Amino acid sequence: MCIRDRCADEAEKIIALEKISAEGLYTHFAVADCPDDEESVEYTKNQSDFILNVYDILCNRGIKLEHLHFLNSAGACYHNNPRSTLARAGIIMYGLYPNYPVKLPIKVEPVMSLKAVVSQVKKLNNGDSVSYGRTYRADGDNITAATVTVGYADGYSRLLSGKADVLVKGKRCPIIGRICMDQLVLDVSGAGDVKEGEIVTLIGKDGNEEITADELASLYGTIGYEVVCGISKRVPRIYVD
């Protein structure tokens, strides 16, 4: 017995369970986001053919399912199939690329921003240290530091310590010292007159500058999807048109 028949047998057993009301059959593409790799394209085609064959076997056995779906974000863009009744858009809903920097054949724009507030501004003297471990020490007397109300408990990764920038008044300002649970510190010396209560942008646009989830992801070896999904529940969500 081939694996397609075995899968159809298992599906039939599940569908026959008393507490189950089956509406469809689906799979999930593993490498649909690699359109320039021949092996990945072939693998995705085989996945598609496999689920279609299992679906047809079930139909031939008199089992009718309303839905057949296997298209994720990349699949819907590169491997669309008229027999698929649904698409499961994920990362593309955030306006992010499934496999950054590989572009999609459609235009997408990031839709999520992450903002926080400056809670304190102070001047640093030469040799002053910032945050846990004293990993940052001021090199000079003309450095303005701003404490910002966001930290790794909000889902802004501690791995971005000393690596990422934050937008303040349209200027990129580097994170100095280690990111804390509830706050981080910026060098805002190049941002002009920064005051307490100033809104800063950790993800999104401010003036002509933009920081994307993909940019942050590249700084600590992950994907943009993890960055946006990692923002914790305690961060208020504001939905705009």
What are these model-predicted stretches?
Residues 4-117, 124-125:
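Active-site loop/helix belt of alpha/beta enzymes
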Residues 116-118, 173-174:
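Small-residue-enriched segments and motifs
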Residues 123-241:
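C-terminal accessory subdomain/extension
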Residues 1:
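Proteins enriched for Cys/Gly/acidic motifs involved in redox and nucleic-acid/cofactor modification
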